[in-house]
Design a protein with these regions (language model features):
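Active-site scaffold segments
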Residues: 49-51, 59
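Basic polyanion-binding and macromolecular-assembly surfaces
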Residues: 1-30, 35-49, 70-73, 78-85, ...
Length: 337
């Protein structure tokens, strides 16, 4: 049964504010930044904290779609376009799904065959204004995730960029510091020995350290899906629906996962009820199984999302060679270490 997206028709974005709680105990470890540490800030309600940044959440929304045991997308999503990078022996190295800069990864740029040159040629950007429809069609062909998580093809042309159409972050409000500490014990020689060169710098001796964790009155996962941007790609009804469903599938898969962000940072949903949208009252985030349903005896998943993937990747007898050439595909390149 198709997922009803009609409540979204008159809206330009879809917002969720998902209440979370610490899975065990009260303390949690937020993300940290070099020379800054935890990102605390003041709001009218008091002291708040950035628990997980937008860039980190983009990686996590990708990770729930990736199967590390097979180095491929999770089975219901296989067929979606991305670039796989292998070494000269044919072993998997990385992919555009996993790379921080996606298509602009140096492992793709410096690989063979020259995928970047092929992409640049298909975009047709050299010494010309950006042909936006041609640009997004090319990105769809090689890495559909870039249309959701954004991409900046700086090494090709500084004008080739797409903003995120799904963005998420986690904040905590009413935070307080939970100070603690620990010690690294040296079982052989607890005291330092400067004369012998056995100092803390080299890792010798007992090394005490401070540790700051946090408690919070409220923890919230904020998510925004830019429906106007997705529709503005002009890629047709099927691709537009695929992108919206894929964005929602990523969010649902993340909140259904253990949400263990770090060693001392595990969350779960605070409320067990339906996840309703903040700005579209009649829309609730579907359950994960609603997107993919079940795997049939023929190996195909019967849900609408995998069905759309098959429709948009499989060749149809009536299609022209030009249309077939624009379809999503898995591209494999080789990077020599």
């Amino acid at each position: 049964m198709p997922i009803d997206l009609s409540p979204l028709d008159k809206h330009y974005d879809l917002l969720f504010e998902v209440p979370l709680k610490v899975r065990q105990g009260h303390r949690f470890q937020p993300t940290g930044f070099p020379d800054l540490g935890a990102a605390e800030f003041d709001t009218p309600e008091g002291r708040s904290l950035l628990v997980e940044s937008a860039q980190s959440m983009a990686n996590r929304l990708e990770a729930v779609c990736w199967d590390e045991s097979t180095n491929d997308l999770v089975e219901p999503l296989r067929g979606l376009s991305y670039i796989a990078v292998k070494d000269s022996s044919g072993s998997f190295l990385t992919s555009s799904v996993l790379e921080a800069h996606r298509l602009n990864s140096p492992y793709i740029e410096k690989a063979t065959p020259n995928c970047h040159a092929e992409i640049q040629n298909e975009i047709g950007v050299k010494n010309r204004p950006i042909d936006r429809p041609r640009f997004v069609k090319t990105v769809l062909k090689y890495d559909v995730g870039s249309l959701l998580h954004g991409v900046f093809l700086e090494s090709m042309d500084g004008r080739l960029r797409i903003a995120r159409s799904i963005s998420a972050f986690i904040e905590a409000d009413g935070v307080k510091t939970a100070a603690s500490g620990g010690v690294k014990n040296d079982r052989v020689h607890a005291a330092k020995d400067e004369a012998g060169g056995r100092t803390a710098k080299e890792g010798f001796g007992n090394l005490p350290f401070p540790r700051d964790e946090y408690t919070a009155e409220k923890i919230t996962l904020y998510t925004s899906v830019d429906l106007a941007q997705i529709r503005g790609y002009g890629l047709g009804e099927d691709v537009t629906r695929l992108l919206i469903l894929l964005a929602l599938f990523k969010l649902r898969s993340f909140v259904d996962s253990p949400m263990r962000l770090r060693t001392a940072c595990s969350f779960e949903l605070r409320d067990d009820g339906d996840m309703g949208s903040k700005n579209v009252a009649e829309f609730k985030l579907p359950k994960r199984e609603a997107f993919i349903v079940e795997r049939g005896e023929n190996g195909n998943w019967s849900g609408e999302l995998p069905a759309l993937v098959r429709k948009l990747t499989g060749a149809q007898p009536t299609e022209s060679d030009e249309i077939k050439a624009e379809k999503m595909r898995l591209t494999t390149v080789t990077f020599t270490i």
